[in-house]
Amino acid sequence: MSKEIPYKIYLEESEIPTSWYNVRSDMKIKPAPLLNPGTGQPLSLEELSPIFCEELCKQELDNDTAFFPIPDEIVKFYKMYRPSPLVRAYFLEEALGTPAKIYYKFEGNNTSGSHKLNSAIAQAYYAKKQGLKGVTTETGAGQWGTALSMACAYFGLDCKVYMVKISYEQKPFRREVMRVYGADVTASPSDTTEVGRKILEQFPGTTGSLGCAISEAVEVAVKNEGYRYVLGSVLNQVLLHQSIIGLETKAALDKYGIKPDTIIGCAGGGSNLGGLIAPFMGEKLRGEADYDIIAVEPASCPSFTRGKFAYDFCDTGMICPLAKMYTLGSGFIPSANHAGGLRFHGMSTILSQLYHDGYMRAVSAKQSEVFEAAELFAKCEGTLPAPESSHAIKAAIDEALKCKETGEEKTIVFGLTGTGYFDLKGYQQYNDGDLTDYIPTDEELEKGFAGLPNVEA
């Protein structure tokens, strides 16, 4: 006899995962190594150490260890907001009239409003353990910067945040939350760094990009003793920490004997998607199960769907290591009209390799469609979703409507990465009819590709 599925499935505190899962351990073809931009050779632990914390460098380079124990102090912090609920979207299902069963993993139940805290607290912990004075980082919409400022406040670390200029101006309240937690927040590009001044000279009036903010944060970290750079997405270590999302999701589904057919996540740099799909992808890689895994990205920043699989810089200033990923070119800057987040030009090397090898697929969505889906979800499910999360909502709705046509009773799981209460400018533009769907032309993309470094893949 099947159990009745509650609206929210909660794990017990004692069921919080005590190890992170490293999906690379099950990948037959490993992600290509990070390269030293000067020599073109794979980066060593010693070369990475001036940029990242020592323990995080080890996590970054380890392709073989399947599980990393989560330190007790991090588990203790996780208990403030974890386990997060897995929610059955009964009201959305009813509104769509679909036979599909829809679930979402809600990661917005903390002050940062998103999943970003899962990795922020881990990276701050290792920085504190190493005896560092502080860390530097970039942030786009502000969720990562907020999460890191919280984590740094908890461990008594300095936190310097370079925030993409367009978001700095559009989201002043997110900036203020960071300042509440003691962070020093600077609009990027800025005149406080060498690379920032260079970009301002090259592109007067630019609204910035994540690639630009990364360059500034890295420069400050390497030039100031006692500081290291930390990143909220893209890196292997970040996807490792975020695996807690997928591990909890799978544990909650297993409690009720539920096997998903489709797993959907929004994709900018890949932290949420990589974390959500981790244990399911592991099963797929080991041949134990099969899932339809879908990455959803903005049509205005289409790394997977229109990008190239090549070595590229992770930053606009071209000072970071080279990563083999799906990329639009490190010089690509999304339109200032793009309100939906997910503005990074590249993608996680892990997800890039998995996509290249056919283990997952990708779709893109126009931001007007994304906000339409977001408002339907808000009306049905009672939570105002972040624009980033709403890309996954859009794809989940599309898949559910396909089931309505075919009569299939598929089980769909997606990641609700966070809340949209600081993203009301985008909602305002949508409701006022001022939101435009910017889609880069082939010619614009070719300009970005022309700047790709000449590296033997």
Regions found by a protein language model. Name each.
Residues 267-275, 367-433:
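Claisen-condensing/thiolase-fold acyl-transfer catalytic domains that form or cleave C-C bonds
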Residues 67-69, 199-237, 245, 257, ...:
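Active-site/ligand-binding loops adjacent to catalytic centers
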